[in-house]
Amino acid sequence: MGQAAWKGFVLSLFDYKTAKFVVAKSKKVGLLYRVLQLIILLYLLIWVFLIKKSYQDIDTSLQSAVVTKVKGVAYTNTTMLGERLWDVADFVIPSQGENVFFVVTNLIVTPNQRQGICAEREGIPDGECSEDDDCHAGESVVAGHGLKTGRCLRVGNSTRGTCEIFAWCPVETKSMPTDPLLKDAESFTIFIKNFIRFPKFNFSKANVLETDNKHFLKTCHFSSTNLYCPIFRLGSIVRWAGADFQDIALKGGVIGIYIEWDCDLDKAASKCNPHYYFNRLDNKHTHSISSGYNFRFARYYRDPNGVEFRDLMKAYGIRFDVIVNGKAGKFSIIPTVINIGSGLALMGAGAFFCDLVLIYLIRKSEFYRDKKFEKVRGQKEDANVEVEANEMEQERPEDEPLERVRQDEQSQELAQSGRKQNSNCQVLLEPARFGLRENAIVNVKQSQILHPVKT
């Protein structure tokens, strides 16, 4: 049994399977197949080719350069600074203009600082003390302003004080104005010039209108109908980013300016236009301890005696990050052929699904399954099968009933009876053959009778 199974397995390795086309008269399966074909065709035409434009070769390696320029002036009149006019050199950092720049909107100024000895500011845990031993000489104050001298300074009869430090004195004040210093910054304008290039297609463009009119950039402002005048009002950018200008100007913040280029180079170059998006990038929760954006800088001077002093400024403002990205597409035969081939493969998957429904799921599935799958043997294999059948016939037991032998003989007689009409010779030979068959039957009877005697 095991040898026969192994032989059958080896022979099955040399079987060849070929497709057989069966026309199934099933309206349900036929309708399902046409619906699947329609869905796949619509997916291929609408989504793949019209929406995703998968027939194009795509270039996402965008090369970009950004130049920014801020213009505007602001006037302030405070008790600490007096009357002062602020221009671009005062409130724009860095002044040369890059894709990241900062506009000052609020200041805390500590003027006339000189290096010397003074008390640390209150509210700094490492600078607080009760006695001199709490202030180790030579140690710096963590998150403070200078080095400890070893003395604890207390006011009046207070038991708590702050360490004496060597620093720029007086130290920076903690108080903050309730209104931004540069309220007029809302009307400042920002000019953003962007150059882009797609190297795969050697395509270049800028976001500024190509014109000979020298006064164009001096009179225009950006709008949805004027995309090639990239001059933005600062207050408008903050509003488009979903923020309030007075709030963000007081404590500062970070705003992203996104320039998106999505170019279809199968169309005219004039159809490749920039799209602008604005978003606030920093933590804008009002109760967060990390909200806002600020940094410090100083301006240094010397008095007539040559002693250096400075004005320390803690600047709050808006940091702008200009982020450019994009892609360009152009027709190419390679992605077109690939996507068409994928669509045809989906068609084949639809046919496979319908085959499963036809031969396994519907009511007459067994009938269709028998019609679809058929085994075909070669002539040599048919001869082998016939030989095996003859061998099995010869191995039939001797005690088989005589009636079955007679039935076989009668069937042979009926098969040969049709040949008697062919010639007279055959008619003459039939009685002799019949006599031989009778003798064979008698011999079989005798063997059956003698068999019990032998045993």
Curated annotation (Swiss-Prot):
Entry keyword Disulfide bond: yes
Region (Disordered): 384-422
Membrane topology: Multi-pass membrane protein
Transmembrane keyword on record: yes
Binding positions (ATP): K69, K71, T189, N294, R296, K314
Ranges that cross the membrane: 35-55, 342-362
Any one Gene Ontology BP term: response to calcium ion
Catalysis performed (reactions): Na(+)(in) = Na(+)(out); Ca(2+)(in) = Ca(2+)(out); chloride(in) = chloride(out)
Quaternary context: Functional P2XRs are organized as homomeric and heteromeric trimers. Homotrimer. Forms heterotrimer with P2RX1.
Protein's UniProt name: P2X purinoceptor 5
Species: Rattus norvegicus (Rat)
